[in-house]
Amino acid sequence: DKVIVEEGSKEFTRNDDINLKIVKSIFSVNNIDLIYFDKNFISIRKAKDSDWDDLTKELLAILNQEITADFKPLIFKEESQFDDDISKRIEEVLNEKIRPAVAMDGGDIRLKSYKDGVAEVLLKGACAGCPSSTVTLKHGVERMIKHYVPEVNSVEAFNINE
């Protein structure tokens, strides 16, 4: 068990300005669309028209080459962009009760905005585009946020990857 990220988490697409060697190496493999880094995992999304059988061997070789004994865990600084009480409370619920469970499935969820009773969240990593994410969002995430932050009437997904 190797710690990949010491602090924070981060998602990369091919269009991002990338200066991390491990990210450049993974994107050197054709048909990789997205890479998401969290504490002890990396989630990689391939193009829809590609096959994991064609990518796995090359990706594993890259990861074994990059994540060696002297690998220094990545640090992604994260600061809250919200100053209102309700948004801060929503972030607290996400960070303490929801994100750890979502991370176990290779994804992440972040508050994008809160206005007039509607919390808009970003789905990242394996959660972005996952067929069951809508059900999880409405029956799990929304229910929990509404329980702890009664001002919230609805939680909606905002997916930047679609």
Regions found by a protein language model. Give the residues of each.
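Domain-level signature for proteins that mediate thiol-based redox and metal-cofactor handling
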Residues: 1-162
